[in-house]
Each structure stands twice: as C-alpha cells, then as structure tokens.
Amino acid sequence: MSRRHVAEKRIILPDMKYNSILLSRFINNIMKAGKKAVAEKIVYSALNKIEKKHSVDPYQTFNNAMHNVKPHLEVTSVRVGGANYQVPTHVDERRGYALASRWIINAASKRSEKMMIDKLAEELFEASNNRGVAIKKKEDTHKMAEANKAFSHFSPKKMK
C-alpha cells in the first residue's frame, strides 16, 4: 500500500428533499448493499416521525443531533521508542461528522424499538437534546482524550 498518494475527496451531491450534503452523507452511511432508495426511505420517514411526534423542525433536529454528537478530540495511537501511547488529537470537521453519523447509526440499531425508522427517530431526537447512547460515546471519547492529556507532546506527524 503506497503512502504517497492521497485519495481525492469525492463530491457528494446534496439530498433531494432538504438540499443538504450532511444529510446525504448520513443517508449513504445508512445504506446497505447499494440500496439507496431504502436508506432514503428510512431517513426521511424517521425525520417525518420526529416532526409528527415532537412537533419540531426535523431538519433542525437532525443538525442539532449531529452537532451535539460530533467529537472535538479523539485519541490516536502513536509508537514512540517501543511503546504505544494514546495521544489526544483534534478532530477535523469532516471526520467529526463522519464519526457522529456512525455513532448515531450504531446507537439507533442497538435500540429496542422494532423498526429502524423508530429507532433512528428516537436516537436523533435524544441526541438533539444531549441524551442517548451516541452522546455517551462522544463523552467517553472526550474522557479518554482528557485522561491521556499527559501524552499530548507526542503529537502525530499529521499534526506537525
């Protein structure tokens, strides 16, 4: 595997309903086996369910959930002198939203509701109100970074 070539960032088109690239990326993360229509149906139905059940703007709820779950710090493993250190590093915006969507989807799929639409709707609403499993995952990540603050001088090469 060559280390010289950096993969080019793909241009992702915004979704049809809300004209949002962030929501389009979220739909792509939900998608399994190339079934984008199914993924879109799940996400849009979950947003409609949020609007009906809680009478709030579903797109604003989605944005709040993603913003609340997005981490600012994470730990990366750095090898120095035969020892591996967990070094806290800043998370750039694109990776932060990627982690947030992954955590929300994983938390939703582990919920007890029967359909993924209900699971996703409840997890998004809870995340927008700073509750839920995805928020807990973000807090755990920040705690890990805080606990390893002493190793921050071993910053990885990409930070220099």
Curated annotation (Swiss-Prot):
GO biological process, one term: translation
CDD domains to which the protein is assigned, alphabetical: uS7_Bacteria
Keyword rRNA-binding: yes
One Gene Ontology cellular component annotation held by this UniProt entry: small ribosomal subunit
Any one GO molecular-function label of the UniProt entry: structural constituent of ribosome
InterPro entries (alphabetical): Ribosomal_uS7, Ribosomal_uS7_bac/org-type, Ribosomal_uS7_CS, Ribosomal_uS7_dom, Ribosomal_uS7_dom_sf
PANTHER family per record: RIBOSOMAL PROTEIN S7
NCBIfam families: rpsG_bact (TIGR01029)
Family note: Belongs to the universal ribosomal protein uS7 family.
Oligomeric and partner information: Part of the 30S ribosomal subunit. Contacts proteins S9 and S11.
Protein name: Small ribosomal subunit protein uS7
Gene that specifies this protein: rpsG
